[in-house]
A protein has these predicted regions:
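STAS-like cytosolic regulatory interaction modules
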Residues: 1-52, 64-106
Length: 106
């Protein structure tokens, strides 16, 4: 999995590309946690447009990030979620606690 990050005026934008499964989630949690610790953002925007697959391990990444940001009084938003990943987020109720936008249909 590839992680691309960019900070813009207090917002840390993180794009995830590839498969977010058990193996990828573990390293992604560490890497994203490190980015948050260094950047101390007011908000984080996950862009999932490049995700080809996500299982429940992706939920662990989201919850871990959400809790870390809560410690900083920062917000989390998830955008451009592909249909397969959206089903996982919806089944877990993530979209009820974190603003989540589906990928636009083109």
């Amino acid at each position: 999995m590839r992680i691309i990050s960019m900070k813009d005026e207090g917002t840390l934008r993180i794009a995830l590309e590839g498969e977010l499964d058990h193996h990828a989630a573990r390293s992604a949690i560490a890497r994203i946690g490190g980015l948050i610790d260094v950047e101390l953002p007011r908000s984080v925007v996950f862009n999932f447009k490049g995700l080809s697959f996500m299982d429940s391990s992706g939920i662990a990444l989201i919850i871990h990030t959400y809790r870390r940001l809560a410690e900083l009084s920062a917000k989390l938003v998830i955008e451009d979620v592909p249909p397969q990943a959206y089903k996982v987020l919806n089944a877990a109720g993530i979209n009820k606690m974190i603003p989540t936008a589906r990928a636009s249909v083109r």
